[in-house]
């Protein structure tokens, strides 16, 4: 059995990424919940960075909610032009409209943009699915 960190060991600052983290199905959100819980129980500082739907995490785990067009939950043609305000949103929509796997790619771009100015805040950045070339 693994014990909590001893006094001579410093806790790690860990970022866990999930482009889609439903707390009820699909696996990624459930995996992030249990992994973050156990890492926190070991004494580490844990941040989960996720796109919608967002996971349900235990108290003490920080959640960074990165927005998206949530194209798996919405009808593609229900998206209003005013929602496609930036280059990233337009590319995400066009990719989905042409059969691309848009959501993981767009999440990777958003996660990279969020992480770059904060790299020194983390010792480990773990992308569970590594579907994002931006990471």
Model regions and ranges:
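A conserved catalytic-core segment of Leloir-type glycosyltransferases
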Residues: 11, 38, 48-115
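Short glycine-rich, flexible loops that bind phosphorylated cofactors or substrates
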Residues: 23, 133-134
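Catalytic nucleophile loop
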Residues: 32, 132-133
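Structural motif
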Residues: 123-124
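Short His-centered aromatic/hydrophobic patch
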Residues: 127-131
């Amino acid at each position: 059995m693994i014990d909590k960190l001893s006094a001579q060991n410093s806790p790690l600052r860990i970022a866990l990424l999930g482009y889609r983290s439903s707390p009820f199905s699909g696996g990624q959100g459930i995996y992030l919940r249990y992994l973050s819980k156990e890492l926190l129980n070991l004494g580490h500082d844990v941040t989960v960075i996720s796109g919608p739907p967002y996971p349900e995490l235990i108290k003490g785990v920080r959640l960074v909610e990165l927005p998206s067009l949530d194209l798996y939950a919405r009808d593609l043609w229900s998206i209003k032009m005013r929602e496609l305000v930036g280059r990233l949103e337009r590319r995400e929509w066009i990719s989905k409209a042409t059969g691309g796997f848009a959501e993981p790619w767009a999440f990777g771009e958003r996660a990279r943009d969020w992480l770059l100015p904060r790299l020194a805040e983390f010792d480990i950045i773990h992308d569970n699915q590594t579907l994002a070339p931006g990471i």
